[in-house]
């Protein structure tokens, strides 16, 4: 999803993925859809593009593995991709600030429902389409923009709070964990 990667850069990317026997498709997004979305100095409107995947990607695409551009992949993602999420909107990984009560107070839901990082998402597009989640995302953006400190990540957490599958932390270990070891929930300590 892009707001305008130049044709020259598209060709460069196509050559890179071709080396690995893969293909790449570019889908242009109209930024006007995001006119009411809050942004900040380091977060652009592009962060919201994932909220409209159902409107842009072909209906034949029913599942997407979304990775932020700063994610480092060290092993095969096959086991993540093969995770059964048919009954869920998405497979998600807990955020390093999962125990921060201020997040739940700001978003106004129970800490028992958890908070996830949106940098790695296994998305069930069929579920999103059937339940019109894109509309729900924009309802939250329009109704509560002041609550959205972490932009689309907060939107996703609010809408998906009861319809997500929590996945092992090994799929998205954020750098902050290395500085805050005592804050890692004990439930994850034995994970490889």
Where are the regions a protein language model picked out?
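Glycosyltransferase catalytic domains, chiefly GT-A lineage
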Residues: 1-192
